[in-house]
Amino acid sequence: MAENLLIHTGSKEEKYRELLPQLQALVSSETNRIANLANIAAALKQTFHFFWVGFYMVEGNELVLAPFQGPIACTRIRFGRGVCGTAWKEAQTLIVPDVELFPGHIACSCLLYTSDAADDKA
């Protein structure tokens, strides 16, 4: 597969519809999980311009940082801690409108609190 994604402008749903078959083609011939996760993270960040997108892998009672795109992240998250650890503990997806208001939120990146962001909060 080509290294370029072909995503047209449109709604988030339309972009996901266009992206999914391209991701499937991208990972179908690669057997290395790390390589596939790295490309998936890059494709999601490139398509949606997310602040951070990535993966954690289970290692014992912790989530360990795996391929990601964005600023430096927490390397390990304990079971039941923060949004990710809580989602793992509850075995379900959590949609959190404002992670700062989530009980037990783990602030992994100070970039969330730049002067522009601080000005927006004031």
Model-inferred region functions:
Residues 46-49, 89, 116:
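Solvent-exposed polar/charged
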